C-alpha cells in the first residue's frame, strides 16, 4: 500500500502516449480498456508508507480526454514482459495481464527500456540518486523522458523544512512520501542543496532492436508527436570554417606585420609603394584555408519520424530506414503467406518474451532447428505459396541494395 497514488511529474522514468489494452480470455484477444482512447502512460517511482529502505515502481496510465486513471500496475521481479510487435507490448504480473498499443516503435523502445531499468533497480536494490540520474540519462530516447523542474511549491517546502535528520539516506527530496534511500550512517543534510540533472535527449543512445524479422501485422506506423528538434542541438553545416566576421570596414589596430613577398598581397595592401623603403602591411593576413580537406556540404539534416535517427535529405533514398513502411515488403509477406509461418512460430515456438527465430534461419546450432523446419515443411504442404517467399525475398533485397525498394526516412514536423 502507498499513500500517494498520483505521482509527481518528476518521479517518472519514462512517459509515452499509448492506448491501454486488456486481455479478453473469452475470445483470446486484446481489447481497448474502458472504451479506449489515447492515454499518457509512464513508469514512476513511489515510496511505500513503511520506509523499508527501497522504493517501488508503478506503471501509471491516465486517459487524456477525461484525466481518468485507467492503469495502475506495480512492477514486480516476476514480471513477464512480451514485445509482440514493434508497436504492441504486453506484460503479466500477479495473474494480471496488461498491454499497450504505442504510436511509434520509438515510443515502444523507450517504454521497454524504462521497464527494464525498473526491474534492474528492483533486482539490484540500487535506488540512489546518482544511479537514478545516470540511468535516466542513458535511457534518453528523444523527448519521451521527463526532466525534473523546480516549482514554487518545492521552494516553499524547502523553507518549512530547513534541516532533516535522515538515518539511511543521502538526501531527501522535497516531495511528500518520496525519498531516495542509500544505506549510510546517520548524518544531517540540508534541503537547500540543488542537484543538477543533465539530460541530453538527442545524444546517441544504445539502440535495442525489438525483433530482427518482420511481423505480418506490419503495415507502417506513424509518429504523431512530431517533436521538433531544438536549434541548439543542430550541428553547423560547415565545421571546417574558422571564424567568420562580416564588417564593412577593416578593424583598425596598433599591430604591424612585416612584409613578406607573397602573391596573396597586392600593392593595394601596402601603405607605401614597393620601392619606398620599409613597407608595413595595414591589413591582417588572410585566414589560412586547408585546401583539399574541406568536406562536401552535408545539406539539410533532419530527424526521422520512424527510427529517430538524423538523416541527410540529399542522400535519402529507399532502403535507408528499416522502420519505415515498405509496401513491397508487406505485399510479399501477405502474398507468400509468410504471416502464417510467423503466427505459428509466435504461438508455438516463442520464448516467454515472445521472441522466436527467423523462419528462414539456417543456424544448425539452434535448439529447435529440426522442429522448426519440420513445422514449416508441413505448413508448406497446406499453403504452397510459402515456397514463393525465398525468391521474392531475394529480389526484394536486391531492390533495397539498388535503392528501388525499402522505406525512406521522413522528417518530423
Swiss-Prot record:
Membrane topology, as annotated: Peripheral membrane protein
InterPro entries: KBD, PH-like_dom_sf, SPRE_EVH1, Sprouty, WH1/EVH1_dom
Disordered, as annotated region: 122-163
Main location: membrane
Keyword Cytoplasm: yes
Classification via CDD domains: EVH1_SPRED-like
Annotated ranges, domain SPR: 303-411
Gene Ontology, cellular component aspect: plasma membrane; transport vesicle membrane
Stretches assigned to the WH1 domain: 5-122
SMART domains linked: WH1
Knockout-associated phenotype: Morpholino knockdown is associated with increased Erk phosphorylation levels and results in a high incidence of embryos showing delayed gastrulation, or delay in elongation during the segmentation stage, with reduced formation of the head and tailbud. Morphants show yolk elongation at 12 hours post-fertilization, indicating enhanced MAPK signaling.
GO aspect biological process, one term: negative regulation of ERK1 and ERK2 cascade
A molecular function (GO) term: protein kinase binding
Domain KBD, residue spans: 195-248
Location within or outside the cell: Cell membrane; Cytoplasmic vesicle, Secretory vesicle membrane; Cytoplasm
Keywords for the protein's UniProt record, in alphabetical order: Cell membrane, Cytoplasm, Cytoplasmic vesicle, Membrane
Keyword Cytoplasm applies: yes
Function comment: Negatively regulates Ras signaling pathways and downstream activation of MAP kinases.
Protein name according to UniProt: Sprouty-related, EVH1 domain-containing protein 2
Organism: Danio rerio (Zebrafish)
